From Swiss-Prot:
Name the UniProt record assigns to this protein: Catalase R
Keyword Heme: yes
Catalyzed reactions: 2 H2O2 = O2 + 2 H2O
MF term (GO), any: metal ion binding
Pfam families registered for this protein in UniProt: Catalase, Catalase-rel, Catalase_C
Keywords for this protein: Heme, Hydrogen peroxide, Iron, Metal-binding, Oxidoreductase, Peroxidase
Native source species: Aspergillus niger
Cofactor (UniProt): heme
A cellular component annotation (GO) from this entry: cytosol
Length: 730
């Protein structure tokens, strides 16, 4: 121990002799290409804002060419000098690289795209982006989770943000939505309470990105408006397969206003053209541990591979007189409008086609606001919406340090901005008008005031008016908090109902207050007795007697994530389990790959080690990586069950991957409800795993029938999950 002090000195001497620390590394062509400049794809951002460092010298922020790898010192071993402006600027910029993360929706991913209108919708709205058939508008979308911090996992059970910006010819229009049709609260003044309840406990900041704790379920059981969204959260909607496989909902009622002043009340969801799909809970937890960027990676990889996510913008268009017509209030954001009551009108299609060039500059700095509207779009008196109009604007001041956040490239409109707003932190414009006030005569009154007839300015729906006494009360038309949760429950297939029960039991098993768990069961009993009884059994509580005041047999369509085939299988992943010790298995996978590629599906050949034609290895793979699985002919020795893993002819145990990894991939894929197939002797693996080849979604055949097997797997991918594999408690 007395010689320990020598170690830093010795390390320093050794380091001085290391050629890689000399600053004179030589680059091979392979090394040089490893950090290629990112190709800037066509995006609605001024190209002059992109920085290309190719062939350049290092400079300071103010343009002086420099060398920034060694501090300025008084002699080689002397103190660093305060005058070293290169050191000070480099460290200062590093110290301030981060901005405050969003309080909610901190973790996200984004993409650019294009919206194309299906028709001229000027009979219902003056919005220019909907004014002509095939009119195209650039887009930027950000998808996110809500509760977790920026470094949390993608597959946490959570509400998911679905915010989309139209860069229209008349300014930016944002639909700031989520993947649930209802929200948890009716009044924005309760939003801090909701967020404080669902965030980690303040004493220990546990749990991260989860509502499986006391304060969340205490709030849900006390604030019964939250029940509807809580059931959506416990269903597959809380753990989507990807951002590509979830819908987006604007939640609120807005108004479309035509040029003649007539207005309609609208709800405007985005419907995924891939179809809606979700993970199962064990799979979501495995993904959280194996790949915390599960959803980000899926979106980022999709577009370069030619899989462009599509979402159809739809509208439920209702008359102003319909506000109370359907048995609930259209101003209530905790309610959805069943599509059987008001069908959806398809307005246009959005296709995402380009990744951001820089995550921080574009995704992190994007600031969406429900107050970003254009002529032809107007608000309603929804009390949650009214509060969001303030909150989303206000939060940008803290995140960006001042009022000029709209000048950040991703936030800039694609038309010139003219107003009398001036100065502030981070001002990026140079105004030339010295007369920044209205009215003025010195600049001939410019910029002029725009209205509906001059300048195509924003205008408020003439129908709108306000009168009444000033009160702090909720409208009686908002008081039914249980009928729509009951309708949602009724609309789920039995397997997804079981998932809801299991999720509620799982989360409340982590609630450390007995009276909160009892309150949860009591509230669920207001929704549906069968639901409450099954949860009570799982929590070891007394089974409640029916409380039928709000019970209903009503159902609606397309609110669950199971039981309907996908609309498209493009971009899904199939694992082909092969072996280096049986080269023919790799060739077999290569032969089948073309058939999958023609359907837009990626076939990934998995072996013990990389080789020609191999996409990945068993050490890197897990059942979460694939939407379907095929076992090659001749590789059955990889799939000995754990009890037989040590038998002489088994290669199930290897230093190249964790014990029994191929076997575990097979077992988990089947357990998660995925299509599973085996070619030839690969069917032995199914037998070892206890998988009956006659089960739905299980396909077998000889090595001469691979084309048939591939076709069956492709058909199985449309089903996506075979729910007969999931146990039901009744």
């Amino acid at each position: 121990m007395r010689h320990f002090w020598l170690l830093p000195a010795v390390a320093g001497i050794a380091g001085a002799q290391c050629p890689y620390l000399s600053g004179e590394m030589s680059f091979t062509q392979e090394q040089d290409n490893a950090g290629d400049t990112i190709e800037v794809t066509e995006q609605p951002i001024d190209n002059t804002l992109y920085v290309n460092d190719t062939g350049s010298y290092m400079t300071t922020d103010f343009g002086t060419p420099i060398s920034d790898q060694t501090s300025l010192k008084a002699g080689p071993r002397g103190p660093t000098l305060l005058e070293d402006f290169i050191f000070r600027q480099k460290l200062q910029r590093f110290d301030h690289e981060r901005v405050p993360e969003r309080v909610v929706h901190a973790r996200g991913a984004g993409a650019y795209g294009t919206f194309k209108s299906y028709a001229d919708w000027s009979n219902v709205t003056a919005a220019d982006f909907l004014s002509a058939n095939d009119k195209e508008t650039p887009m930027f979308c950000r998808f996110s989770t809500v509760v977790g911090f920026r470094g949390s996992v993608d597959t946490a059970r959570d509400v998911h943000g679905h915010a989309c910006r139209f860069y229209t010819d008349e300014g930016n229009y944002d639909i700031v939505g989520i993947n649930f049709a209802p929200f948890f609260i009716q009044d924005a003044i309760q939003f801090p309470d909701l967020v404080h309840a669902i965030k980690p406990m303040p004493n220990n900041e546990i749990p991260q990105a989860a509502t499986a704790h006391t304060s969340a379920w205490d709030f849900f059981s006390q604030q019964s408006t939250a029940l509807h969204s809580a059931l959506w959260l416990m269903s597959g909607n809380g753990i989507p397969r990807s951002f590509r496989h979830m819908n987006g909902y604007g939640v609120h009622s807005f108004r479309f206003v035509a040029a003649n002043g007539t207005s309609k009340v609208v709800r405007t969801p985005w419907k995924s053209q891939q179809g809606v799909a979700s993970l199962v809970w064990d799979e979501a937890q495995a993904a959280a541990g194996k790949n915390s960027d599960y959803h980000r990676q899926d979106l980022y990889n999709a577009m370069p591979n030619g899989h462009y996510p599509k979402y159809e913008l739809q509208a439920q268009i209702m008359d102003e007189a319909d506000m109370l017509r359907f048995g609930f209030d259209l101003l209530d954001p905790t309610k959805l409008v069943p599509e059987e009551v008001v069908p959806y009108t398809p307005l246009g299609m959005m296709e995402l086609n380009a990744n951001p060039t820089n995550y921080f500059a574009e995704v992190e700095q994007a600031g969406f606001q429900p107050g970003h509207v254009v002529p032809g779009i107007d608000f309603t008196d929804d009390p949650l919406l009214q509060g969001r109009l303030f909150s989303y604007l206000d939060t940008q001041l803290t995140r960006h340090g001042g009022p000029n956040f709209e000048q950040i490239p991703v936030n800039r409109p694609r038309k010139p901005v003219h107003n009398n707003n001036r100065d502030g932190f981070g001002q990026q414009q140079i105004p030339t008008n010295n007369w920044a006030y209205t009215p003025n005569s010195m600049s001939n009154g410019y910029p002029m005031q725009a209205n509906q007839t001059q300048g195509h300015g924003f205008f408020t729906a003439p129908y709108r008016y306000a009168s009444g006494h000033l009160v702090r009360q909720t409208s009686p038309t908002f008081n039914d908090h249980w009928s729509q949760p009951a309708m949602f429950w009724n609309s789920l297939i039995p397997a997804e109902q079981q998932m809801v029960v299991n999720a509620i039991v799982f989360e409340n098993s982590k609630v450390n207050s007995p009276h909160v768990r009892k309150n949860v069961v009591n509230q669920l009993n207001m929704v549906n007795n069968n639901l409450a009884v099954r949860v009570a059994r799982g929590l070891g509580l007394d089974e409640p007697s029916p409380n039928p005041t709000y019970y209903t047999s009503n159902k609606t369509s397309n609110v669950g994530t199971f039981g309907k085939p996908l609309l498209s299988i493009e971009g899904l992943q199939v694992g082909f389990l092969a072996s280096n010790s049986h080269p023919e298995s790799i060739k077999q996978g290569q032969a089948m790959a073309a058939q999958f590629s023609a359907a837009g599906v990626d076939l990934n050949i998995v072996t013990e080690a990389y080789a020609d034609g191999v996409n990945t290895t068993y050490a890197l793979s897990d059942a979460i990586d694939f939407d379907a699985l095929i076992i090659a002919d001749g590789v059955q020795s990889l799939f000995a069950s754990p009890a037989l893993a040590n038998q002489m002819n088994s290669t199930a145990t290897s230093t190249l991957y964790p014990p029994a990894r191929p076997f575990q991939i097979l077992v988990d894929s089947f357990r998660y409800g995925k299509p599973v197939a085996a070619v030839g002797s690969g069917s032995v693996a199914l037998k070892n795993a206890g998988i009956d080849s006659s089960r739905s979604g299980v396909y077998t055949g000889s090595s001469e029938t691979t084309e048939k097997i591939a076709k069956e797997v492709l058909e199985g991918l449309y089903t996506f999950r075979f729910v007969d594999r999931f146990a039901l408690d009744e």
